[in-house]
Structure formats: C-alpha cells, structure tokens
Amino acid sequence: MGGLWCPGWRLVASCGRGWRQPGWSGRTVVNAELVLRPGWDGLGGAERGLRRLGTWKRPCGVRGPATQPPRRPRSSNPFQRAQEDEWRRRNKTVLTYVAAAAVGMLGASYAAVPLYRLYCQTTGLGGSAVAGHSSDQIENMVPVKDRVIKVTFNADVHASLQWNFRPQQTEIYVVPGETALAFYKAKNPTDKPVIGISTYNVVPFEAGQYFNKIQCFCFEEQRLNPQEEVDMPVFFYIDPEFAEDPRMVNVDLITLSYTFFEAKEGHKLPVPGYN
C-alpha cells in the first residue's frame, strides 16, 4: 500500500500500544490511523490524508493555475539570441520605411496638381501659356513680320454648368512680338445666379511656353445673374523667340481653348501667376 501508510502504524493499532511519533500528540497518532487507511495509495492518498490532519502544504515547486500562457524563453545560445535581435531590428526598420513612404505618397497626392500646374505655367509644358511678362518687355518687343501665325479659338462648357459659352471670332492672324485682342461671350440662360470658373490650354503643347497672356478671365470666378450675357476679353502675344526655336519651324497654327466649370462661391483654383 502506497501513500503515507506504514506497516509499523498498523502494528501499533493492532497491538493497542501507545506508540507515538516524537513531537506528535496521542490524538495525532489516532487521527493518523483513522485517515491513513488502505485504498489511499500514491500521491493522491497522501494528499487527502494530510488534508484531513490539517498539515497539508503545497510543495514549493508546484504552481497554482496559470493566469496567462508562459512566455517563450529566450535561447541560451548567444549566436541565436543575436540573430533574433537582428531580425527584430530589421522588422522595425522596414515598418518605419513603409510608414514614411505612405505619409509621403499621401502628401504628394495633395500637392501634385498645384505643383504640376505651376510647373507648366513656368515652363510652358503641357500646353499652358507662360505668365510673368513685364510692361518693359512688351514695349521693347520687335515684331517678326515674316512669321505669320494663325490662332484659332475654342470654347467648351462642363456638363455641370448650364451656360452658353463661345468665342466671338474663330481665328485671327498674328506675328511674334505683336499683341492681339480676342473676345469670348458667356450667357447664363437659367433663372438663378451661377458662378463659373475657367481653365485653358494651348495646342501644340510646345508652343505654350511662347504664348503669353496679358489679360484674361481664366482661373477667376465669373458670376452671371439670370439671363445675363457678358463679353470676356483675352489680351495676349507670342514671344519673338518663337521664331528662333527650331522646334517651331513648321508650326503656323496655334489653338487656344477655354473650358468653363461651375464653381462654388469663394473657391479659386490654386494656380498663382495666371492672368
């Protein structure tokens, strides 16, 4: 029989002798005989017997129910620990780069449109006319009489805007270094005030860097009352350097196009420097 049952205790019980363990009272010996009996084998029997005696204590190396799963112990191998630390450092670096790239792409998406328009306005690329002329430059220009250029005009209206918009002339002939004046006409046929705003471009695109507008109605809000009709002037010139550019040798036709959109009051397109 296992547990804490000892043959000597059975002998004491059967012979009726007053045997006792040193330090134990007689009552404790009797209690031991009563609680440590056959059938209580193994560690389970010992634990139940000691609980009945009131002397049971949990062994030092035994823990209670775990409140959380044990952590994975770090490797005792120095090389493996260094490798794990290196992987953690690399993962943090990659996450930092990914987050920075995401923020940068978000900022670039907001700034792309105004920056591209400003770039086109400065360089003339993308079919945008160049601003930044001065009165002295205009007064000192020398017309290139033997280089006649045909300028045609086009007008479009976005589906959101219920306006009638058209050029008053279909074409004019100019020479580089000479100013020219053209007109567009816009009408609001509705029964309520409408605010419109226009953009423009020049074709061919390469000619945009030489097409300078002194005065126009683009990128500015235009408010038309019900049934109101207005004339919109465009005062422009073609830079004399147009005639000296080898790329413009075969260019004798330039088209200026305007497109009107409906705008909310107080809204302006973020393109500085346009006239």
Curated annotation (Swiss-Prot):
One of its GO terms (cellular component) is mitochondrion. Residues 57-86 are annotated as: Disordered. The chain crosses the membrane at residues 95-113. It is found in: Mitochondrion inner membrane. It comes from the Eukaryota. InterPro entries: CtaG/Cox11_dom_sf, Cyt_c_oxidase_assmbl_CtaG. It holds the Pfam family CtaG_Cox11. Keywords: Copper, Membrane, Mitochondrion, Mitochondrion inner membrane, Transit peptide, Transmembrane, Transmembrane helix. Residues 114-275 are mitochondrial intermembrane. Disulfide bonds: none annotated. GO terms for biological process: ATP biosynthetic process; intracellular monoatomic cation homeostasis. GO terms for molecular function: copper ion binding. It is a single-pass membrane protein. Belongs to the COX11/CtaG family. Exerts its effect at some terminal stage of cytochrome c oxidase synthesis, probably by being involved in the insertion of the copper B into subunit I. Interacts with CNNM4/ACDP4. Interacts with RANBP2. This is Cytochrome c oxidase assembly protein COX11, mitochondrial. It comes from Mus musculus (Mouse). The gene is Cox11.
